């Protein structure tokens, strides 16, 4: 993370090396502050998505950093793109509550769209539903393939 701009270089492997001072990482890599944990649990309950799955996405997207912005403009802990954030009613993508709730709603919609298939939902979260439709599954983009594998590895750990 660049301390002056709070940006990071979005890599195929996610946002490795980024951490927030409030994050406590343990063996599974999905442990976060109690405040964030409470938000993940509320979002999981509200949108019917496993809290561990939401945390796996956040771990891969931002390493639980609430203030980061990717090269492509994705913002906050769940790395919402501005247009997606707006469509989800997120007015401040750096607010952890709004961002996690928006990300949970979005992945819930993708899970519904793909009949509960987590890999396809993740591919759509990362590369867009249009690309999933175009390629009839996970797109042949290294970034997306690595992203799906990494999130699922965190989730299954």
Predicted regions and their residues:
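Export/targeting segments at the very N-terminus of extracytoplasmic proteins
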Residues: 4-64, 83, 97, 104
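Solvent-exposed, acidic/flexible segments
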Residues: 29-37, 46-47, 51, 70-78, ...
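Short, solvent-exposed positions on alpha-helices
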Residues: 52-55, 119-123
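Amphipathic alpha-helical polymerization modules
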Residues: 38, 42, 94, 105, ...
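A cross-kingdom feature marking charged/low-complexity
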Residues: 45, 153-157
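Substrate-binding/active-site groove segments that recognize
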Residues: 60, 67-90, 99-111, 123, ...
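Flexible, glycine-rich active-site loops centered on histidine and acidic residues
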Residues: 132-138
């Amino acid at each position: 993370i660049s301390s002056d701009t709070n940006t990071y270089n979005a890599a195929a492997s996610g946002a490795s090396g980024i951490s927030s001072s409030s994050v406590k990482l343990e063996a599974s890599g999905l442990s976060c502050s109690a405040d964030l944990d409470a938000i993940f649990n509320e979002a999981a309950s509200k949108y019917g998505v496993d809290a561990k799955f939401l945390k796996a996405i956040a771990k891969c997207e931002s390493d639980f950093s609430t203030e980061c912005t990717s090269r492509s403009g994705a913002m906050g802990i769940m790395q919402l793109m501005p247009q997606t954030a707006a469509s989800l009613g997120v007015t401040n993508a750096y607010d952890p509550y709004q961002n996690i709730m928006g990300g949970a709603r979005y992945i819930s919609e993708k899970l519904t769209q793909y009949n509960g298939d987590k890999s396809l939902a993740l591919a759509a979260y990362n590369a867009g539903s249009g690309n999933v439709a175009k390629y009839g599954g996970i797109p042949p983009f290294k970034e997306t393939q690595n992203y799906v594998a990494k999130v699922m590895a965190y989730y299954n750990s």
